[in-house]
Curated annotation (Swiss-Prot):
Pfam families: MPC. May mediate the uptake of pyruvate into mitochondria. GO terms for cellular component: mitochondrial inner membrane. This is Probable mitochondrial pyruvate carrier 2. It is a multi-pass membrane protein. It comes from the Eukaryota.
Amino acid sequence: MNALRGLLNKYTGNQIVFSNKYATTFFEKFPKLAFLNNVTNLAPMMKWSLSIVPITQILSGTKLPENIDVYQASSLCATGSIWTYYATLISPQNTGTRMLAACNAAMAACHGYNIYRRTKWEKSQIIPIENKN
C-alpha cells in the first residue's frame, strides 16, 4: 500500500493536466486556451460531455434505441443520481456545488430516458403468440 501511495504522491495536489513540452508551447502560443490545462476547468467540461452527447443524440435521433447499451446507461444514470444527491449535501452551497448538481442531474435524466427508450423498443419487438384453438 505504501508503494502505491508513493507512486501516486507526485500527482496529489497537481492542477496541471498536460505538462509535456508540446502542451506547454501550445498553451503559451494560445493563452486563451490555457484554462483547458487545469483540472479544475477540464473535469467539469468532461463531465458535461457525458450529458450533452446523449442529449444531442436524443434530439437529433442519431442514436437509435436498439443501439443503446443498457448497462452503460444504467451505470451513468446511477452515477448521476448519486452525485446529484451528494452535491446537495456539500456545505456551504455555492455556484460550483449547484452546477455539480445540475450536471449530474442532467446526466441521470438523459441516461434514464435512454434506458426508457431501450426498454420501450425491446417491448415493441416482442411478437405476440396467437391462440390456435
